[in-house]
A protein has these predicted regions:
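Extended glycan-interaction surfaces of carbohydrate-active proteins
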Residues: 21-61, 73, 91, 97-109, ...
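Well-ordered alpha-helical scaffold segments within catalytic/enzyme domains
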Residues: 1-2, 69-85, 129-146, 190-201, ...
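Short acidic, glycine/Ser/Thr-rich loop/turn "cap" segments at secondary-structure junctions
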Residues: 50-59, 77-85, 113-118
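Alpha-helical positions within canonical tetratricopeptide repeat
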Residues: 2-6, 90, 94, 149-152, ...
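Membrane helical hairpin/interfacial module
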Residues: 1-31
Length: 314
């Protein structure tokens, strides 16, 4: 529980430092905000395929999913009685400015979860996380018996939900798509199941899982999206997307298929069990940042999702 306490405190410190509720999408471990990106003049990069970048330009971006991610991370502290923390009304009120930001920005263009540098759209995954911010604030308020606040946040969540359903579903693609009114597919919409936006058996969610698997799946691996980005058409699988797919398949009742993909995906780890950010389809070679937190969290979440209850083995 100590790790959870420290994590919650780090989140709340980030919230306390925010100006007007705005939080940049990436911070240093010590909450540093200036993460100026530069290219190393001496490092050649993996197999000479530079450039090697130091810092992260994303600190300048506007990514509206940030607010939902922080509130999702903080919400369990209000309900988990193992954590001896003061997570009452004061902490809730500290989170509300983030909810206000999510509400104001839920249908505004941003750089999206993938930190795209060259275009801004109303990304479905960003709107989804804005919905999650309002939804969880409503649940926290109800838990704290703050009836007026609970009603307000629940109403806002419902408004955002309706906009996503109206604008992100594509009849032509038979799936939820990357952005409002768009037509391209993006693996991040699979998070709809994980955050509880739609019931797993909703036909639209099932159709989305199947369509994304068909178009973006490459064996056990998965592309982030099908459209060219700042660096061209994606050529390798982004590992956390493959774990999102596994989670979604398990949720819609295809556990054995999910388990098979999970076991195949684990073969991409190194001899220490660590996993990179990306994997080359043909060779299984790790690319990108290493080790990658997203990938390692994907392993943990996937194992928990697919674990059989011990009673089933008796």
């Amino acid at each position: 529980t100590r790790t959870l306490e420290h994590y919650f405190q780090w989140l709340m410190n980030a919230v306390a430092d925010a100006e007007g509720g705005h939080i940049q999408p990436v911070l240093g471990l010590g909450l540093e905000t200036a993460l100026t990106e530069r290219i190393s003049p001496t490092l050649q990069g993996f197999r000479g395929m530079g450039p090697v970048r130091i810092g992260n330009q994303a600190h300048e971006h506007f990514q509206h999913d940030t607010y939902g991610n922080i509130i999702l991370g903080a919400a369990p502290a209000f309900f988990d009685h193992r954590l001896p923390m003061n997570t009452g009304r004061t902490a809730f009120e500290q989170l509300e400015p983030l909810g206000e930001q999510a509400w104001e920005l839920h249908d505004e263009p941003d750089a999206g979860i993938w930190e795209l540098r060259s275009r801004a759209r109303i990304h479905t995954s960003s709107s989804l996380m804005c919905w999650a911010a309002c939804d969880r604030l409503g649940k926290i308020a109800r838990h704290l018996k703050l009836d007026d606040r609970a009603a307000l946040w629940a109403e806002r969540a419902e408004v955002i939900r309706d906009k996503i359903l109206d604008n992100a579903w594509s009849e032509d693609r038979g799936a939820f798509v990357e952005s409002f009114g768009g037509s391209t597919l993006d693996a991040s919409v699979l998070l709809m199941g994980e955050v509880g936006f739609l019931p797993p058996k909703d036909p639209r969610f099932i159709a989305t899982v199947e369509r994304l698997s068909e178009v973006l799946g490459r064996g056990p691996f998965m592309l982030r999206y099908e459209e060219a980005d700042d660096f061209g058409v994606p050529e390798v699988g982004f590992n956390v997307c493959a774990f999102w797919r596994i989670d979604a398949l398990a949720r819609i009742g295809r556990e054995e298929e999910a388990r098979k993909l999970f076991e195949e995906l684990l073969e991409a780890r190194n001899h220490l069990g660590l996993m990179s950010e990306d994997t080359a389809f043909a060779t299984g070679e790790g690319w990108g940042n290493f080790p990658q937190t997203y990938s390692m969290v994907g392993i943990i979440n996937g194992a928990m999702r697919l674990s059989r209850r011990w009673e089933a083995e008796l």
